[in-house]
């Protein structure tokens, strides 16, 4: 016999946060690449049979915009309505603090992960998250340097993903 529960679609909504670095060091072309990849991810997520709740956070050293996405038409409209906000320095910790506030308030109840599209220049959080965290970079995995010559160090607890011209959405 097949249990009734085996026929039910799960009601749990998967939640994903996509952060897009709009700081001054991210040139317009790079931000457009972030948008293209974000669009590809969102369309892929929506193709699953279950509901999704995605938040796109545009940020530099502060939260510039927080856009909730729950429907296919919103996914297609997002790049059309995008305009760069911010353009200051990057502090990744701002997004992580903001996500914690959303979780504590109940706005994010089942966070599966956070993808942060960035050039890598900025202040990283020291404390590991209890959800999967991926920093997405364009180019190869050659260690990047700050303007003062220091190697940029992504926290060990975060996944580093490098997208080349061949792997872009």
Regions flagged by a language model, labelled:
Residues 21, 34, 119:
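Hydrophobic, well-ordered secondary-structure elements that form the walls
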Residues 14, 24-57, 130:
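…and closely analogous acidic/polar surface helices at protein-protein or active-site interfaces
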Residues 124-128:
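Short, T/G/N/S-enriched strand-turn elements that build extracellular solenoid repeat scaffolds
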Residues 129-131, 156:
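Short, structured coil segments at secondary-structure junctions
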Residues 63-68, 74-123, 137-153, 164-167:
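Von Willebrand factor
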